[in-house]
C-alpha cells in the first residue's frame, strides 16, 4: 500500500453549507483523495485532532467562478444518487489555479479502473420479501438486457432541483411503481469523462436492507443519468401522522426501531445518511418503514448570488451541521430524535418561520416535552436531541448499540426487527404493490408522455432550469425535495 502524503496545504475560505458565511479553514489535500479542514493550522501533519471538515476529491468535478466572491472554486461530486457541492475562495487567481491543479492531479491519480463493462447499465432484483434467490440471480444475469427510458410510463413530478428531477414512473412490463431520479450528466461529469463517476460512488454497491429504498436500475442516455428506485405504496409517514396528529408511543417505537436498524446497517458501511426527516419516510404495503433516497440536494446548493438559501428542510438540521463543523454518524441520531419527537408530540421540537431564529433555537434552546410523555420516551428524546454530538445518544463509539440499548426500546428484539417479524401497528389499506390509493388521484388517472425514443430531451418535463436561477424546493404530501 502506498503511504499517504500531504500534496498541498494552506488556508482557504470555505462557505457554510446552510448559514452562508465564509469561514477560514486550514486544509490538507492528501494523496488518498482526502481533503480535510481545521480551524487552526495543525501542529503536526499526523496529529489526531479531529478535523472540522473531511471530504474526498475522488471523482470530483472542479469549477471556477467569480461569484459570490472573486477567485472562488467549487468541488462537485456524486454522493449515492445525490449531487453535492462545496465552495471555497482564495486571495488570488494564481492561488486558485494551484489548488485546482493539485486537486485535479490527486483525482486523476485515483482513477485506476478496469476497462470493459459500461457501469451504468445496471439491473438488480428487488429485495422485497417476494424475491427469491433464484429470481435475484436471473435479474442480475440479465443485466445486459438494457433498460431504457421507453420501459416506463411517466406519471408525476415528485421533485425538481438544480441538477435534475424525480418522477413517479410505472414500469410497463410489471405495472410496478418506482421513483426515477434523472440527473444531467454535464453537471456531474467533466466533458472529457465517461459516466463511470457513478460506479465510483456508492450507487452500485447495491445497498440491501429491508427498510432502505433499493436502487432497482441505473442507466444512462447520452446526456442523463437515470436511477430507478423503489417507491413504497403504503403512503408517506407524513401523510399518516398529519391525519392522526400524534402516534402512540408503541407505534413510534415500532417505526423508530426500523429506522435504527437501517441506520445501524448504513453506519456499519461507513455511510452517514444525513437526511432523516419525516418526508423521507414511507410505508410499504405491509406497514414497514422505507427510507427513501429521492432527494435532489442534501447540501445547500444555491445560486452564488444569494447569501441565504436552503436546500431541504432546515428544521431537521443538527447543531453541528449549522455550525459547519464536520459531522459524523451522530447527525443521523439527531434526525431520528426529531422524527420520533414529531411522532410522539405531534410537532417539531424546534420551529420558527424565521430561519435565523430557528437556527438560534436549534443551537441554544432546551428541549421541552408534553406532560403526557412517559419517562422512557422523554429520556430517549433528550438523549437523541443533545446539542453536542459527542454527548448525544448514539454519539459514542458503539453508535447504534447505545440507542438500541436505551430503555425505551427494552421490549424490542432487534433480530426480529430486521427479519420483519414484528407486526406493524398499522397496515395500509392496499391490496398489492400496484394499488395506488395513497397516491394523488390527479396522477394515477393518466400518464404523461415525455419519452419519444430519440428526442425526449427536447420535451419540457426533462428540460432543466437555467443555471442562473435555481428553484427552491417546496414540500407537500406528494412532493419531496
Curated annotation (Swiss-Prot):
Pfam families: PH (PF00169), Pkinase (PF00069), Pkinase_C (PF00433)
PROSITE patterns named among the record's database cross-references: AGC_KINASE_CTER, PH_DOMAIN, PROTEIN_KINASE_ATP, PROTEIN_KINASE_DOM, PROTEIN_KINASE_ST
EC number in record: 2.7.11.1
Entries under Gene3D superfamilies matching the protein: Phosphorylase Kinase, domain 1, Pleckstrin-homology domain (PH domain)/Phosphotyrosine-binding domain (PTB), Transferase(Phosphotransferase) domain 1
Keywords of this entry: Acetylation, Apoptosis, ATP-binding, Carbohydrate metabolism, Cell membrane, Cytoplasm, Developmental protein, Diabetes mellitus, Disease variant, Disulfide bond, Endosome, Glucose metabolism, Glycogen biosynthesis, Glycogen metabolism, Glycoprotein, Kinase, Manganese, Membrane, Metal-binding, Nucleotide-binding, Nucleus, Phosphoprotein, Proto-oncogene, Serine/threonine-protein kinase, Sugar transport, Transferase, Translation regulation, Transport, Ubl conjugation
Mod. after translation: Phosphorylation on Thr-309 and Ser-474 is required for full activity. Phosphorylation of the activation loop at Thr-309 by PDPK1/PDK1 is a prerequisite for full activation. Phosphorylated and activated by PDPK1/PDK1 in the presence of phosphatidylinositol 3,4,5-trisphosphate. Phosphorylation by mTORC2 in response to growth factors plays a key role in AKT1 activation: mTORC2 phosphorylates different sites depending on the context, such as Ser-474 or Ser-478, thereby facilitating subsequent phosphorylation of the activation loop by PDPK1/PDK1. Ubiquitinated; undergoes both 'Lys-48'- and 'Lys-63'-linked polyubiquitination. TRAF6 catalyzes 'Lys-63'-linked AKT2 ubiquitination; this modification may be important for AKT2 recruitment to the plasma membrane and for AKT2 activating phosphorylation. When phosphorylated, undergoes 'Lys-48'-polyubiquitination catalyzed by TTC3 in the nucleus, leading to its degradation by the proteasome.
InterPro entries listed in its UniProt record: AGC-kinase_C (IPR000961), Akt2 (IPR034677), Kinase-like_dom_sf (IPR011009), PH-like_dom_sf (IPR011993), PH_domain (IPR001849), PH_PKB (IPR039026), Pkinase_C (IPR017892), Prot_kinase_dom (IPR000719)
Chain positions recorded as ATP binding sites: 158-166, 181
Main location: cytoplasm
Residue ranges constituting the PH domain according to the UniProt record: 5-108
Residues the record marks as carrying a glycan: 128, 131, 306, 313, 474
GO molecular function annotations of the record: ATP binding; metal ion binding; molecular function activator activity; protein serine kinase activity; protein serine/threonine kinase activity
PANTHER family (alphabetical): RIBOSOMAL PROTEIN S6 KINASE
Subunit note: Interacts with BTBD10. Interacts with KCTD20. Interacts (via PH domain) with MTCP1, TCL1A and TCL1B; this interaction may facilitate AKT2 oligomerization and phosphorylation, hence increasing kinase activity. Interacts with PHB2; this interaction may be important for myogenic differentiation. Interacts (when phosphorylated) with CLIP3/ClipR-59; this interaction promotes AKT2 recruitment to the plasma membrane. Interacts with WDFY2/ProF (via WD repeats 1-3).
Implicated disorder: Defects in AKT2 are a cause of susceptibility to breast cancer (BC). AKT2 promotes metastasis of tumor cells without affecting the latency of tumor development. May play a role in glioblastoma cell survival.
Function of the protein: Serine/threonine kinase closely related to AKT1 and AKT3. All 3 enzymes, AKT1, AKT2 and AKT3, are collectively known as AKT kinase. AKT regulates many processes including metabolism, proliferation, cell survival, growth and angiogenesis, through the phosphorylation of a range of downstream substrates. Over 100 substrates have been reported so far, although for most of them, the precise AKT kinase catalyzing the reaction was not specified. AKT regulates glucose uptake by mediating insulin-induced translocation of the SLC2A4/GLUT4 glucose transporter to the cell surface. Several AKT2-specific substrates have been identified, including ANKRD2, C2CD5, CLK2 and PITX2. May play a role in myoblast differentiation. In this context, may act through PITX2 phosphorylation. Unphosphorylated PITX2 associates with an ELAVL1/HuR-containing complex, which stabilizes CCND1 cyclin mRNA, ensuring cell proliferation. Phosphorylation by AKT2 impairs this association, leading to CCND1 mRNA destabilization and progression towards differentiation. Also involved in the negative regulation of myogenesis in response to stress conditions.
UniProt domain comment: Binding of the PH domain to phosphatidylinositol 3,4,5-trisphosphate (PtdIns(3,4,5)P3) following phosphatidylinositol 3-kinase alpha (PIK3CA) activation results in AKT2 recruitment to the plasma membrane, exposition of a pair of serine and threonine residues for phosphorylation by membrane-associated PDPK1/PDK1 and activation.
Name of this protein: RAC-beta serine/threonine-protein kinase
Gene for this chain: AKT2
Amino acid at each position: 500500500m502506498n503511504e499517504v502524503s500531504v500534496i498541498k496545504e494552506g488556508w482557504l475560505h470555505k462557505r457554510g453549507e446552510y448559514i452562508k458565511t465564509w469561514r477560514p479553514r486550514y486544509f490538507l489535500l492528501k494523496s488518498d483523495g482526502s481533503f480535510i479542514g481545521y480551524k487552526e493550522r495543525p501542529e503536526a501533519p499526523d496529529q489526531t485532532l479531529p478535523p472540522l471538515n473531511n471530504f474526498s476529491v475522488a471523482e470530483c468535478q472542479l469549477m471556477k467562478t467569480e461569484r459570490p466572491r472573486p477567485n472562488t472554486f467549487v468541488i462537485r461530486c456524486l454522493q449515492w444518487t445525490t449531487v453535492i457541492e462545496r465552495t471555497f475562495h482564495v486571495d488570488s487567481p494564481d492561488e486558485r489555479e494551484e489548488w485546482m491543479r493539485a486537486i485535479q492531479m490527486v483525482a486523476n491519480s485515483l482513477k485506476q479502473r478496469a476497462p470493459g463493462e459500461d457501469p451504468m447499465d445496471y439491473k438488480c432484483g428487488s429485495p422485497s420479501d417476494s424475491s427469491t434467490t433464484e429470481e435475484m440471480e436471473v435479474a442480475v444475469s440479465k443485466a445486459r438486457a438494457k433498460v431504457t427510458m421507453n420501459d416506463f410510463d411517466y406519471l408525476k413530478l415528485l421533485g425538481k432541483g438544480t441538477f435534475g428531477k424525480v418522477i413517479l414512473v410505472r414500469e410497463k412490463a410489471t405495472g410496478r411503481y418506482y421513483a426515477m431520479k434523472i440527473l444531467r450528466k454535464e453537471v456531474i461529469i467533466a466533458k472529457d469523462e465517461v459516466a463511470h463517476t457513478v460506479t465510483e460512488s456508492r450507487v452500485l454497491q447495491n445497498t440491501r436492507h429491508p427498510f432502505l429504498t433499493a436502487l432497482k436500475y441505473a442507466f444512462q442516455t447520452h446526456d442523463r443519468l437515470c436511477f430507478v428506485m423503489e417507491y413504497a405504496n403504503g403512503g408517506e409517514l407524513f401523510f399518516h401522522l398529519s391525519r392522526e396528529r400524534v402516534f402512540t408511543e408503541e407505534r413510534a417505537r415500532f417505526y423508530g426501531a426500523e429506522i435504527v436498524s437501517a441506520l445501524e446497517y448504513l453506519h456499519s458501511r461507513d455511510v452517514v445518511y444525513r437526511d432523516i426527516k419525516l418526508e423521507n419516510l414511507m410505508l410499504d404495503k405491509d406497514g414497514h418503514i422505507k427510507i427513501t433516497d429521492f432527494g435532489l440536494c442534501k447540501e445547500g446548493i444555491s445560486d452564488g448570488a444569494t447569501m441565504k438559501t436552503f436546500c431541504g428542510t432546515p428544521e431537521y438540521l443538527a447543531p453541528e451541521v449549522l455550525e459547519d463543523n464536520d459531522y459524523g454518524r451522530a447527525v443521523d441520531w439527531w434526525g431520528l430524535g426529531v422524527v420520533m419527537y414529531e411522532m410522539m408530540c405531534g410537532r417539531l421540537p424546534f420551529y420558527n418561520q424565521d430561519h435565523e431564529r430557528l437556527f438560534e433555537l436549534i443551537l441554544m434552546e432546551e428541549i421541552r416535552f408534553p406532560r403526557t410523555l412517559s419517562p422512557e420516551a422523554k429520556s430517549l428524546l433528550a438523549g437523541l436531541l443533545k446539542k453536542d454530538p459527542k454527548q448525544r445518544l448514539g454519539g459514542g463509539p458503539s453508535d447504534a448499540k447505545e440507542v438500541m440499548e436505551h430503555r425505551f426500546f427494552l421490549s424490542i428484539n432487534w433480530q426480529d426487527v430486521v427479519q420483519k417479524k414484528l407486526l406493524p401497528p398499522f397496515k395500509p389499506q392496499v391490496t398489492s404493490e400496484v394499488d395506488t390509493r395513497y397516491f394523488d388521484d390527479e396522477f394515477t388517472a393518466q400518464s404523461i408522455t415525455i419519452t419519444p425514443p430519440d428526442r425526449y430531451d427536447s420535451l419540457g418535463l426533462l428540460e432543466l432550469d437555467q443555471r442562473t436561477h435555481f428553484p427552491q424546493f417546496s414540500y407537500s404530501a406528494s412532493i419531496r425535495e
